[in-house]
Amino acid sequence: MKNNFIIATHNIHKIKEIETILNFYRQHGEGYRKKLPQQAFPPESTVSYEENAKEKALFISQQLPAAKIIADDSGLELPAFPGRYGVQTARELAQEVPDGDLNDYLIHLVDGKSRQFIMKTTIALAINNQVVKIGHGQLKGTIAHAERGVNATGFDRIFIPAGESQTLAEMDQPTRISYLHRARAVKNLLDQLGE
């Protein structure tokens, strides 16, 4: 059965990616602003991906209780820098690279160190003001020495999944989706729903 999920985020790029992933799995998704005016989400915690995802999903579920609300939280973990980034990835990188090139920054950050990375995503599904399922996904791999590929943007141009030689941006869409941390979290969630 095709589900219609409402995506609880302001991030247009994240909405587009989740819509594409849901469509790939024969589901439907749309940003919450197609149903509500823009909302001021509560500040994210620094506790866990799961807590942040739950809070965002519940916040929109309170206003759209009959809808299937999904929200995620993701982060980058670098074995070369234990304790850095993680749940606070977006905030920390925004401070370190206010208007710069994040890919170039990460490429040089790991020079002479382990180039390994782990991207983690937790996605929460809320219905009727209750979190009913939590999906988890992660991608492990290495950071390339330079951007490669045109099939995607952002970190996909520097992330090489473990066991592969291509960056995510060099892969065709079905292959790339199979590796994406967010897609793996969505798939984990859909599997729990029996979809």
Swiss-Prot record:
It holds the Pfam family Ham1p_like. Its cofactor is Mn(2+). Its EC number is 3.6.1.67. Keywords: Hydrolase, Manganese. Maximum activity is obtained with Mn(2+) and activity is enhanced with increasing Mn(2+) concentration, at least up to 8 mM. Has low activity with Mg(2+) or Zn(2+) ions. InterPro entries: ITPase-like_fam, RdgB/HAM1. Optimum temperature is 35 degrees Celsius. GO terms for biological process: nucleoside triphosphate catabolic process. Pathway: Cofactor biosynthesis; tetrahydrofolate biosynthesis. It catalyses: 7,8-dihydroneopterin 3'-triphosphate + H2O = 7,8-dihydroneopterin 3'-phosphate + diphosphate + H(+). One of its GO terms (molecular function) is nucleoside triphosphate diphosphatase activity. Optimum pH is around 6.5-7.0. SUPFAM superfamilies: ITPase-like. It is an enzyme of class 3 (hydrolase). One of its GO terms (cellular component) is cytosol. The active site is at D73 (proton acceptor). Belongs to the HAM1 NTPase family. PANTHER family: INOSINE TRIPHOSPHATE PYROPHOSPHATASE, INOSINE TRIPHOSPHATE PYROPHOSPHATASE/HAM1 PROTEIN. Pyrophosphatase involved in the biosynthesis of tetrahydrofolate. Catalyzes the hydrolysis of dihydroneopterin triphosphate (DHNTP) to dihydroneopterin monophosphate (DHNMP) and pyrophosphate. Shows a strict substrate specificity. Has only weak activity with GTP, ITP, XTP and dTTP, and cannot use ATP, UTP, CTP, NAD(+), NADH, diadenosine triphosphate, diadenosine tetraphosphate, ADP-ribose and UDP-glucose. This is Dihydroneopterin triphosphate diphosphatase.
